[in-house]
Structures are given as C-alpha cells and as structure tokens.
A protein has these predicted regions:
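Glycine-rich loop(s) and the adjacent beta-strand/alpha-helix scaffold that form part
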Residues: 1, 8-82, 244, 259, ...
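A glycine-rich dinucleotide-binding beta-alpha-beta segment and adjacent secondary-structure elements
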Residues: 1, 7, 175-250, 257
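Hydrophobic residues embedded in beta-strands of well-ordered beta-sheets
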Residues: 4-6, 144-145
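Secondary-structure capping and boundary motifs in well-ordered enzyme cores
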Residues: 18, 34, 158, 211, ...
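Short helix/loop capping segments that flank catalytic or ligand/cofactor-binding pockets
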Residues: 19, 39-41, 73-74, 134-137, ...
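Conserved hydrophobic/aromatic pocket- or pore-lining residues that grip, position, or stack substrates
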Residues: 30, 166, 219
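FAD cofactor-binding and catalytic pocket of flavoenzymes
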Residues: 48-170, 177, 202-215, 235, ...
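Internal hydrophobic alpha-helix adjacent to the cofactor/substrate pocket in enzyme cavities
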Residues: 165-173, 264-275
Length: 275
C-alpha cells in the first residue's frame, strides 16, 4: 500500500497433503531468501528497479585426482592455496562417493574403470574472481526463477590457469591420474600432458559450479545502481528490508559467509536502534 508493505501471502502444505492459504500481516518485512530467491520474490511482488541484476559468483572448475593410497573422505578439507589471489584460489572439495562419480563423468572415461578404488580419489577446485555478471528473473507462470550468467574471455582464461595450477599441485602431491571437469577433457598423468587443458577450457566444455551467489539486491547510497540502501532497506519502501547475501556488491573472492553474517547483524542492530 503506497510505500509500505503490509504483509505476505503464502501457502502452507500440511503433512496430509492439504494446502492452506495464509496472509501474514506485518509492520516490517525482512526478505532473506538468498541471492536467487530474494530478488525473485521481490519481482513477483512488483518490485523490479535494480532487483535481480548484477548477479556475482565465484565460477569454479574441478579435478578428480587419483592417488596411490586411500584419502580421507570424512569431511571437506579446509586447505586453501592463495598464492594466485585475488583472481584464483585453490582448495579441497566434497569427496564422498557420489561427488567423485559426478566429477569423473566429464572426461568420458569408462565409468567402472574410473570409479575403481574410488577411496583413492578426491576432488579439488580452482575458483576465480569473475569479471562477468548475471541476472535473476521471475517469469510469469514459471515456479523457479531464471538464472543466467555470462563469463568474460578473462574469466575463461583464469579458469584454464586455475585448472593447470591445480593439476601441477596435485601431481606434486603424488596424484597419479587427473580427471578435469571438462567435457571430453584429457585425463592427465604427467606434467607434459597438461598443455591441452589451456585450449579445452571453453564456455561450451567446462563443467563449472559455484556456491557463493551475491549482488542481486546491491546495497549502497546511489539509487541508480543499487536496490537497497546501505542498511538493506529497499528503495521507495519504508518498511521493506533485505538482509542476506543479495546485498553484497560483489563476490569477494573468499567464502562470503562471515561478511553476510556481519552485515546482517549490523543491519539488525541499526533497525532495532531506530524503533
């Protein structure tokens, strides 16, 4: 109603399958759905100005590495190589059997042969600071939002560089076989076989992933470039706030969890102090 949000309409599904439609009335509304679903919810509510644009992330390429001995799959290894920061970071990834099977699929090696002695295999990543950006758009009649992202030529080059550096590290650590997350990519056993990776990493062939999504409701004081002010209040609405990773203006090159928690705490403190 005007410059105020008065509540939210939602549906609750009961254990028996019944659906109940609810309206929750509120004096203040905080949207915390993450960098994909926060902008999608705002867009479905008719709020589009600087909402959903500028999606940022850390595009990530991986290698499944086979060692001559079993490796520990109990947890995600907390090791990280920052020698090539701020543009490339290298580290360990989740390596349970399902993750390994998925990581081995890209090169086209015979499945049973590749997965033999799977407990000798672990997955590692190279993530980049990306110059590209993306968009989140809620489409009429479609339940899930459309998410798109465009890599630049520099991004593709950094991904290839990260893959090669990661391969060099793993061979030095004793790996005997490297499967890159590149469709049809060469399986490498020695350093002198790695040169082909530079040309194999393309937009069409690289099988990338990311877990760090930000920047779809950027915070700041320039209304022409941001979706919310510096404390997460959505422009043109007195009582509507965003308080999640959508606010971070760029992907920071590291896990943004601590930054998100710090910003959310600061925004809550500012809100409570004003009441």
């Amino acid at each position: 109603r005007g410059d105020r949000i008065v509540g939210a309409r939602c549906r609750r599904t009961h254990p028996g399958g019944g659906v109940e439609r609810l309206t929750v009335w509120a004096d203040h509304v905080f949207v915390c759905g993450g960098a994909v679903h926060t902008p999608a919810l705002l867009q479905r509510s008719g709020i589009w100005r600087n909402i959903g644009n500028g999606l940022k992330m850390h595009p990530t390429i991986k290698i499944a590495a086979r060692f001559p001995h079993p490796v520990d799959h109990g947890d995600v290894p907390m090791h990280r190589v920052t020698e090539f920061s701020p543009f490339v970071a290298i580290g360990g990834s989740a390596s349970r059997k399902g993750h390994i099977a998925m990581a081995l699929a890209d090169t086209g090696a015979p499945y049973d042969e590749a997965l033999a002695d799977w407990d000798n295999i672990a997955v590692y990543y190279a993530a980049i600071r990306s110059e590209g950006s993306g968009r989140v758009a809620a489409l009429r009649g479609v339940r899930s939002p459309l998410v798109t992202y465009s890599l630049t030529e520099a991004d593709v080059s950094r991904l290839a560089r990260g893959l090669v550096h990661l391969g060099e590290l793993l061979l030095a650590a004793g790996a005997t076989e490297l499967h890159p997350s590149v469709v049809g990519g060469r399986i490498v056993h020695r350093l002198d076989e790695m040169g082909s990776w530079w040309d194999e990493v393309t937009r069409a062939r690289a099988n990338l992933m990311t877990v760090h999504l930000t920047s779809t409701v950027r915070m700041g004081e320039n209304r022409g470039r941001t979706g919310a002010d510096s404390f997460g209040r959505v422009w043109n609405y007195r009582n509507l706030r965003v308080n999640d990773g959508s606010l971070i203006p760029d992907a920071p090159g590291v896990n943004p969890q601590a930054a998100i928690m710090a910003i959310a705490t600061r925004n809550c403190d500012q809100f409570l102090a004003a009441q």
